[in-house]
From Swiss-Prot:
Listed SUPFAM superfamilies: Aminoacid dehydrogenase-like, N-terminal domain, NAD(P)-binding Rossmann-fold domains
UniProt-listed InterPro entries: Aminoacid_DH-like_N_sf, NAD(P)-bd_dom_sf, SDH_C, Shikimate_DH, Shikimate_DH-bd_N, Shikimate_DH_fam
Subunit text: Homodimer.
Single GO biological process annotation from the record: amino acid biosynthetic process
Entry's transmembrane regions: none
Enzyme category, top tier: oxidoreductase
Pfam families: SDH_C (PF18317), Shikimate_dh_N (PF08501)
Protein name listed in UniProt: Shikimate dehydrogenase (NADP(+))
MF (Gene Ontology): NADP binding; shikimate 3-dehydrogenase (NADP+) activity
Record: residues binding shikimate: S22, L23, S24, T68, N93, D108, Y230
Annotated residues for binding of NADP(+): G133, S134, G135, G136, S137, I228, G251
Metabolic or biological pathway: Metabolic intermediate biosynthesis; chorismate biosynthesis; chorismate from D-erythrose 4-phosphate and phosphoenolpyruvate: step 4/7
Length: 290
């Protein structure tokens, strides 16, 4: 990031660690090419995100960033302004970098919610929803689910009791939804109450510990599993749920929809049906061939 990027082209990117699995560059650069937009989307793999890093991005002409593991909570803290999801849940996955200020957004929840509505809307109505994990993605997803008015009860299962209880408090305080932190043992004993499982931890991700978070015995044909890990296409958790007959929402759908919102924030251009269809096909082909 030492040299200034092309002044006529707009430059965006993704920041996180690790990023070898990321398909975000494929998504954004392909749409820029399809639409004839003079822009590029780069990869910035860094274990640290701080004010110095942000200033380096600004000095290099970076106008916007997708933010992923492990920087979503830090991204919110570094912003001067933030959307309502970021403000309430204290996590952001998108930064717009202006000359004098940084604006944070969270498109995770919107991407996840749209995926559920398209592929398994019934799972929101017939039972309770449990979110596995308490990181930045879990925060955004919990907020959008609570704000949707479609659910009454949310469970959160995480080994980090402190952050889990914080998320439950924020959701219960800012919505009409009761969110409860439960242990993995308690979750197993209440599995008949669950219709939708949303997995948000890195377990199963390419290059990470395989998991699964839950065994095949937990799932049944009346459940839907939404594993937001998209690379590989079938994680050990997805395979376990499939064996039990559960319905699957692929993580690539959330990646697709949250990226479409980021594209709009970055460029000011609303994605159309063709953009979504082409991107879905590219993701499917890439993940199938890996």
């Amino acid at each position: 990031m030492n040299s200034k990027t092309n002044q006529t082209a707009k430059t965006f990117g993704i920041v996180g660690f690790p990023l070898s699995h990321s398909l975000s560059p494929l998504i954004h650069n392909s749409i820029y090419k399809d639409r004839g937009i003079d822009a590029s989307y780069l990869v910035f793999e860094t274990p640290e995100l701080n004010s110095k890093t942000i200033q380096e991005f600004r000095n290099s002409g970076i106008l916007g960033l997708s933010v992923t593991i492990p920087h979503k909570e830090k991204a919110f803290l570094l912003a001067d302004k933030a959307d309502s999801t970021s403000t309430i849940m204290k996590a952001s996955n998108t930064l717009l970098i202006g000359p004098d200020s940084i604006h944070a957004y969270n498109t995770d929840g919107e991407g996840a919610y749209r995926s559920i509505l398209e592929l398994s809307p019934e799972s929101l109505n017939v039972g309770n929803t449990v979110i596995l994990g308490s990181g930045g993605s879990a925060r955004g997803i919990a907020y959008n689910l609570a704000a949707s008015g479609k659910i009454q009860n949310l469970f959160l299962c995480s080994r980090n009791e402190m952050t889990a209880k914080e998320i439950c408090f924020l959701i219960s305080k800012n919505s009409n939804v009761k969110m409860e932190h439960i242990t993995q043992d308690s979750l197993f004993s209440r599995k008949e109450e669950i219709s939708l499982v949303i997995h948000t931890t890195p377990l199963g991700m390419k290059g990470q510990a395989p998991g699964p978070f839950l065994s095949e015995k937990f799932f049944n044909p009346n459940m839907t599993l939404f594993d937001i890990v998209y690379n590989p296409l079938e994680t050990p958790l997805v395979k376990a749920a499939k064996k039990a007959g559960a319905k699957i929402i692929p993580g690539s759908e959330m990646l697709l929809h949250q990226a479409m919102k980021q594209f709009e924030l970055f460029t000011g251009i609303s994605p159309n049906a063709s953009d979504i269809l082409k991107t879905r096909e590219r993701l499917s082909q890439t993940l199938t061939n890996q």
